[in-house]
A protein has these predicted regions:
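Cysteine-cluster motifs in flexible loop/terminal segments that predominantly coordinate metals
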Residues: 95-152, 156-158
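Short, well-ordered coil/turn residues at beta-beta hairpins
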Residues: 44, 94, 267-269, 375
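Short Gly/Pro-enriched turn/cap motifs at secondary-structure boundaries
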Residues: 18, 29-30, 62-68, 140-145, ...
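Local beta-strand N-terminus motif with an aromatic residue
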Residues: 88, 150, 195, 240, ...
Length: 376
């Protein structure tokens, strides 16, 4: 079938993106789902920094490619061998498919699935298949097994989690990345305890999700750190106990003074080495630093090893919040419905697919938390 999609043909075009237009809205071919696959109608798709990283080259992908990895959709066709999802079901797309059989999947760590990572890196679906192509022929890649910046997508069954039908599309989409990654880092990777002192460095959709999760987990201090005053003000409105400007040369001393020597848990969500360095240095002796920000693959962090050893510090990476999506999406939705995780507050604005390039500029400037594309 023919579908409209945002296609990235060249990586690294300069900002402003409203002028360089790295994403072109094109008609592309979408093949029928194969065994173990679904065709879904994309209802809403979030614009995430990982999408920007694909466009500016921080996270290289094969091109041409249809970006988009955070979305909610309706199932419109079911391939053979899919027995537990039916036409009409509502689903959240998950950007790391899991095979269910590799060593990591076998021990309950699907975020580390080897075949899932390999298929993502190659721009295909789980198993190496591609269901997208350019009109007239030519390879077209799937971003993270989702390719959600399109009217429809063909995805692996293992790239979706069914959700309640009454959850609004614009809110449901956020659970696929911002919530899984941010809240998962708190509940799964760090497993913070009630009464802990916490800090979040970097207030995008993932960072705000971490902040909300820390509050929900019963953290005593929830400190927010960013470079934009508007985001710091928003953090206070959402329940942060204190906020600090990351550009202030005294920010390290300020946080340590405010917390009596540092926080128990610091979450780096900015995807930049200076943010990771700050997150590490504001933790106390015996503290834990969790990084989920995904900097450029060439970025190197020079760690003072003796401080990590002598002060018994812990550093943890967190990918997709160390989540088991089939468990954690329903879990976080239940917390949202109970008023403990106000995911709806992440939504900055809704846009149309053909407004995506100017939206990239707002994302790059840090002016939005989550812009969500609503498909016509």
């Amino acid at each position: 079938m023919k579908v409209r999609a945002a296609v990235l043909r060249q990586i690294g075009l300069p900002a402003p993106y409203a002028q360089s237009r790295p994403l072109s809205i094109e008609e592309v071919d979408l093949a029928d789902p194969g065994p173990g696959e679904l065709r879904v109608k994309i209802r809403a798709a979030g614009l995430c920094h990982s999408d920007l990283s694909a466009i500016n080259g921080d996270r290289p992908w094969p091109v041409p490619i249809v970006p988009g990895h955070e979305a909610a959709a309706e199932v419109v066709e079911v391939g053979s061998a899919v027995l537990d999802v039916k036409v009409g079901d509502h689903v959240v797309l998950v950007f790391r498919p899991s095979c269910g059989a590799c060593p990591d999947c076998s021990v309950g760590r699907p975020a580390l699935c080897g075949p899932g990572g390999e298929s993502n890196a190659a721009g295909g679906l789980l198993g190496g298949y591609r269901r997208l192509s350019l009109v007239g022929g030519g390879t077209l890649h799937h971003h993270m097994g989702c390719a959600a910046f399109a009217e429809y997508a063909t995805v692996s069954r293992r790239s979706v989690v069914p959700i309640d039908r009454d959850l609004p599309w614009t809110q449901a989409a956020l659970f696929g990345c911002a919530v899984l990654t941010g809240a998962g880092a708190v509940f799964n990777t760090a497993r913070i305890e009630a009464g802990a002192k916490t800090a979040v460095v970097g207030l995008g959709g993932v960072g705000f999700s971490s902040l909300m999760a820390a509050i929900a987990a019963g953290a005593r201090d929830v400190i927010a750190i960013d470079v934009l005053p508007a985001k710091l003000e928003r953090a206070l409105q959402l329940g942060a106990t204190q906020v600090f400007d990351a550009r202030d040369p005294e920010v390290l001393a300020q946080v340590k003074a405010a917390t009596g020597g540092g926080v128990d848990y610091a979450f780096e969500m900015a995807g930049a080495v200076p943010a990771l360095e700050l997150a590490y240095r504001i933790t106390r002796r015996g503290g834990t630093t969790v990084s989920a920000g995904l900097p450029n693959p060439a970025a190197i962090w020079p760690l003072q090893a003796v401080s990590m050893i002598a002060e018994e510090r812990t550093i943890k990476g967190s990918y997709i919040g160390s989540c088991v999506p089939s468990r954690d999406v329903p879990r976080f939705v239940a917390m949202f419905r109970a008023g403990r995780l106000p995911v709806d507050q992440l939504l900055s604005e809704t846009i149309r697919l053909d407004e995506i390039n100017p939206a990239l500029d707002r994302l790059a400037r840090g002016e939005s938390v989550r812009q969500v594309i609503v498909m016509d």
